[in-house]
Every structure is written in C-alpha cells, then in structure tokens.
Regions:
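Ligand-binding pockets and gating/stacking loops
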Residues: 1-205
Length: 205
C-alpha cells in the first residue's frame, strides 16, 4: 500500500490530497490507539476517585459524570485542546433534566447534586497539577429560565435574555462578575453582550 501511495505521488507531483488523507487517517489511528490507556481509570488513586465522587454507589449518574470529569483531566494532561462534558441528565432517560418546564425543584435538586462535587473536583485537580493556568473551563447553557412560573406547571419557561455562564482558569480574574439583570432577573440591562462576544472571549483566551 505504501508503494502504491508513493507511486501516486510520483505520478501526480503537487497533488497533496492523498498525502493529506493519509496523514488524517494516521492521526485518527494514533488517537484510537491511545484511547484504551487514557480511558482506563483503574490507575487513578482511590483518593482521586473519592474527591470526584466516582465511587458514589448511591448515585450512579453522579458517579458516571465524575468519571467523565476525571477522563477530561486525563485528556487535558495529554494535550487534547477541546474537551466537552455533559452532566449526565439524559442518563436518567430524559425525565429528569435541566429543561425545567415542570418538576423544576425536583429536577434541579437532583442535577445540582450530580454536578457539584465532580465539577469542583475537576477544577481543583487541574489547579493542583498546574494545568488550570493554561486551561479555560467554561460552564454555560444556551438559555436560562424565566423568573416566574410557567402557566399550569411547576416549572419555568426558557429565558434567552438573562442567564449565567462562568469561566475559570487561563488567566481569568477570580471573583469578577460582568453584567447585570433587572430586579426580576428577567433580562440583562447592563454590560449586555451577544453570544458572539462570549465566543470571541473564549477563543481569545
């Protein structure tokens, strides 16, 4: 196969499409070969598993999210530049999630318990390993919830005009809050920025 590829390059000088495709396949192969080692959490010390909550047998969804947070740290350690995490809401079959049109208190109480310990442990772990100063952690959503109950339900409708996201690491100043909503928490009224600005900030950092 290598000889055929070399012959193609010789017969078609300047044609970089094949070389680019070969390089992409080789990169994909190397990535796949590294997955078993990266995803093997058996080498993690017991105190790390406890810190993240990965050993929480009473809350398997939380334990699963905790393992994903540990995996995220391991990926960052190996130079992966973008890692995305979900908090495990749909591991419950989608009934209990952040889309709180109904059962809002039940849903949010449960999912706050799922993400709180693992997320905090991830940030602390990155910091203790000297990785946080070069890693931007972003916690965000596509919209918030209205400050009043949805008609006929025990929940709240979508609110695209006022919600919270946070960042840490990568030189972010601690304790800084930017933007203010009105007195009801309904809409941003000061230092209002479109999502384009948010995305630009992430890319800049």
């Amino acid at each position: 196969l290598g000889q055929l590829n070399q012959r193609h390059l010789e017969e078609h000088p300047g044609d970089e499409k094949l070389a680019a495709r070969i390089a992409s396949y080789e990169l994909a192969a190397r990535m796949q070969l590294s997955v078993p080692e990266i995803s093997d959490l058996s080498t993690e010390p017991a105190h790390i598993l406890r810190a993240y909550g990965a050993d929480d047998t009473g809350n398997p969804i939380k334990a699963g999210f905790a393992r994903n947070c540990i995996l995220a740290r391991r990926l960052v350690e190996r130079g992966v530049r973008f890692v995305q995490l979900f908090n495990g809401a749909y591991a419950s079959g989608g009934e209990l999630n952040w889309d709180g049109h109904n059962k809002l208190k039940e849903q949010y109480d449960r999912h706050a318990g799922i993400l709180d310990q693992p997320a905090a442990a991830l940030i602390r772990d990155l910091g203790q390993r000297g990785l946080l100063e070069n890693t931007l952690v972003v916690w965000c959503t596509e919209f918030g919830r209205m400050p009043f109950f949805q008609k006929g339900a025990q929940g709240r409708d979508h609110n695209p005009d006022g919600f919270t996201s946070w960042m840490t690491g990568a030189g972010i100043r601690k304790g800084v809050s930017h933007g203010v909503t009105d007195e009801l928490g309904r809409a941003a009224v000061k230092d209002v920025h479109p999502l384009y600005d948010f995305n630009a900030t992430v890319l800049h950092l």
